[in-house]
Each structure stands twice: as C-alpha cells, then as structure tokens.
C-alpha cells in the first residue's frame, strides 16, 4: 500500500489504519464519534494527502480546463477555488473536484479524489494532446495536503502567526509559511465547519507537527476518515464511488449548480442538455429515519403506500451523532423526491419509515 508523509505520525498516535483506495490511512485514532464531536466542537486535523493534486499550466490551460470541467473558470479570481465536475461524453461523472486558480496567469491546481487520480490524469493527458501551450503535471507525490477543520481553527492559525488567514473568505486562498514549508492555505473543507486546507510544498511532517502541537491547547486532535465521512454526510456532500460515479450525472445528483451550460462547449454538455430537456428517471434526495435504525449504502428504498414497490436505493447512510437519528442520501423515482414524502427503507428485512428532507442535515451555528 501507498503511504502519505504522515504515516509515522499516524502510527505513533495509535491510529487504526485501513486500506483506502490503495493507501494505508487512519480510519480513527480515539474513535469515530469522539473525533466527530471534536471537530464539531473544537477542531480536528485530517491527513488528506491521499487525494490527487494536478497542476495545469500555460497560456492554453484555462480554455482547456473550460472544456474539461462543468463549472465556469472565468468566474474565478486569482487565489480562488470552485467546486466542479469532470464528465465523460455521456454526461457521467468521472470525478468531482476542486479547481484553484493560482497567482500566475494560466496556472491551476486541481484537487481530485484518491480513487480517481490516475483516471483523471490519463483523461486530461489524452484530451490535452495537441493543445497549444498547456502542460499537465501530476504533483500528488510532491504536494501534501492537510485539513484543519473546526471552530478552533481560527485561533490555532493565529497562534502560529497566520492571523492573516482570518481575512480569507470561503474558497479563497493565499500562500503562507508554516514551520519551514511553503503552503497554499485555503478556506475549503469537507466537514461543514470553519477551517482551512493546507497544500504543503516542503517538509510536510513539520507542518503537521506544528499545527498539532500548537493546537493542543485549543483542543485539537487528529481525526480519521471515519469522522470525515460522518461530517460530510451531515452536510449532504457527495462521496465519489457511493453517491456518484460514471453512471450518474450532475443533474441527477442535484449538482446542476456546478454546471454552467452558458459558458459554451465542454465534455458531456450535449448529453446533459438532452437529459435536462427529457426529464430525469431518478432524483437524489436526503432522508431521515422516523424510527431508531441505521441506513447503509445499497439498502433498498420502498414506497410508503406500497412497501413491495422498489423506488430507489440508499447511497450513503449512518447514525447522526448530533441528531441521534439515522440519516441518508440516495436516488428515488422523481415522483417520490418531494420534501416530506414518506418512504420505507429496507434495513435487513425490516421496513423502517423515513421521510424526504433537504440536506444539509446540520448547519454550523453563525457567530
């Protein structure tokens, strides 16, 4: 298995390590729910270096990426990021990504999912052949990635001399020095909490140690992928391989807001327009259980009026520690997608009542 620069720190902290997309990664340290509450109430430090980081540069980079992604890069200012998708010709989602416009003209950083890194590098390289002045470079091995998430993040970065990060608005970024490493610090994350992600261009372990040691007095703890998944589920954030894949489209997945048809041609545009005009055969919804139980990926969604009728499938589900009820995401036939619609979830042969709700299931308190 592959390892991030922080494997020694994970082992020293007693992490339970698992295989995730070919990487040996911490699923938890002290426990998934404990780490979840730490992030919701204080702050957690996540190793997300297993994700892919692709740099696209050159005078032709912007027009190339406009054709390869669904969102509109023209809307991005320097040092700003946007959520976007890479689609195939049929409109299926090859990956959901973050695109950062960096300071120099024609320089972009793409953050892609770990399981899709090789696929996206190959896809971009294939489509980039013959594009004038456009270089595609997989820099995943050179750039580490750390997420500092939670309300205490603001105080932690101030304590290490980075109070200027407080000026960043959501999805903005800037370059900073942490320990002895240059970093791109961004107001981004996958938890729904206030926080930052650090793209580390130098000695990555020194950045991890600096953040963790400084943050201890603020209640900071390392957090694993288990807590990260719970946190993103409560926000209704999509998980590639569970909620979306190449058999689903952005429109079906409720992510049409990340598709800008008006910008012009991009891969998958025509197929998505046809689907939009023809109507959907399924819609992505959130739901909450009305009785105590836990929904899981792959469970069947049934009609409340006719419990023998299969109307959809759960793609993500768990017990929300905050709400103390089962919550989930999934696809249902369009006529069952209205808010408040009653459903049944088949949980190991038992039909558990549920209702359609609009994610996020959790909203961070405004301060």
Where does each model-flagged region fall?
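Acidic, proline/glycine-enriched N-terminal capping motif
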Residues: 1-84, 92-94
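Cytochrome P450
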Residues: 87-101
């Amino acid at each position: 298995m592959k390892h991030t620069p922080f494997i020694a720190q994970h082992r020293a902290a007693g992490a339970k390590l698992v295989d995730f997309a070919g990487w040996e990664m911490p699923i938890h340290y002290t426990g998934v729910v404990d780490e979840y509450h730490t992030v919701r109430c204080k702050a957690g430090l996540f190793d997300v270096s297993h994700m892919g980081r692709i740099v696209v540069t050159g005078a032709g980079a912007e027009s190339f990426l406009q054709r390869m992604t669904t969102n509109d890069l023209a809307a991005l200012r320097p040092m700003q990021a946007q959520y976007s998708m890479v689609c195939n010709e049929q409109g299926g989602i090859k990956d959901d990504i973050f695109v950062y416009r960096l300071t120099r003209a024609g320089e972009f950083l793409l953050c892609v999912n770990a399981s899709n890194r090789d696929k996206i590098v190959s896809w971009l390289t294939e489509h980039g052949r013959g594009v004038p002045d456009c270089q595609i470079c997989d820099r995943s091995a050179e750039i580490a990635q750390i997420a500092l998430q939670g309300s205490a993040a603001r105080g932690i970065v101030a304590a290490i001399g980075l109070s200027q990060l407080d000026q960043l608005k959501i999805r903005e970024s800037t370059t900073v020095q942490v320990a002895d490493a240059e970093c791109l610090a961004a107001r981004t994350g996958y938890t729904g909490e206030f926080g930052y992600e650090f793209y580390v261009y130098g000695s990555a372990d020194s950045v991890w140690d600096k953040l963790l040691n400084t943050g201890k007095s603020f209640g900071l703890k390392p957090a694993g992928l288990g807590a990260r998944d719970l946190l993103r589920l409560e926000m209704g954030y999509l998980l590639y391989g569970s909620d979306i894949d190449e058999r689903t489209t952005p429109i079906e997945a409720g992510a049409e807001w990340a598709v800008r048809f008006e910008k012009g041609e991009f891969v998958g545009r025509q197929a998505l327009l046809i689907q939009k005009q023809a109507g959907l055969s399924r819609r992505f919804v959130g739901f909450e259980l009305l009785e105590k139980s836990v929904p899981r990926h792959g469970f069947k969604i049934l009609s409340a009026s006719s419990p023998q009728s299969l109307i959809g499938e759960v793609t993500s589900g768990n017990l929300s520690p905050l709400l103390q009820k089962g919550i989930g995401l999934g696809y249902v036939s369009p006529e069952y997608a209205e808010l408040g619609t009653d459903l049944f979830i088949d949980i190991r042969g038992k039909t558990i009542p549920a209702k359609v709700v609009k994610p996020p299931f959790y909203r961070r308190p405004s301060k």
